[in-house]
């Protein structure tokens, strides 16, 4: 995938793992409900649309304050 670039996406979400998780969850929502927020997305696949939403800051990730304490 060339657009949006990974560098651009990592300025929005700090971790590649988190980026993939957020995009996958949003893509699953779009498959079920078909509710893309972007009017004319470049990508036709749900994962690409989710990454575009993250890049345009329509979709944001807010980290939770839950921590694991041993």
Curated annotation (Swiss-Prot):
InterPro entries: DNA-dir_RNA_pol_omega, Pol_omega/Rpo6/RPB6, RPB6/omega-like_sf. The keyword Nucleotidyltransferase applies. One of its GO terms (cellular component) is DNA-directed RNA polymerase complex. The keyword Transcription applies. The RNAP catalytic core consists of 2 alpha, 1 beta, 1 beta' and 1 omega subunit. When a sigma factor is associated with the core the holoenzyme is formed, which can initiate transcription. Belongs to the RNA polymerase subunit omega family. This is DNA-directed RNA polymerase subunit omega. The lineage of its organism: Bacteria, Bacillati, Bacillota, Bacilli, Bacillales. The gene is rpoZ.
């Amino acid at each position: 995938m060339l657009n949006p670039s990974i560098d651009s996406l990592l300025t929005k979400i700090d971790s590649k793992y988190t980026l993939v998780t957020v995009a996958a969850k949003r893509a699953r929502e779009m498959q079920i409900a078909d509710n893309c927020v972007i009017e004319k997305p470049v990508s036709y696949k749900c994962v690409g649309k989710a990454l575009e939403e993250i890049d345009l800051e329509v979709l944001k990730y807010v980290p939770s304050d839950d921590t694991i304490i041993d």
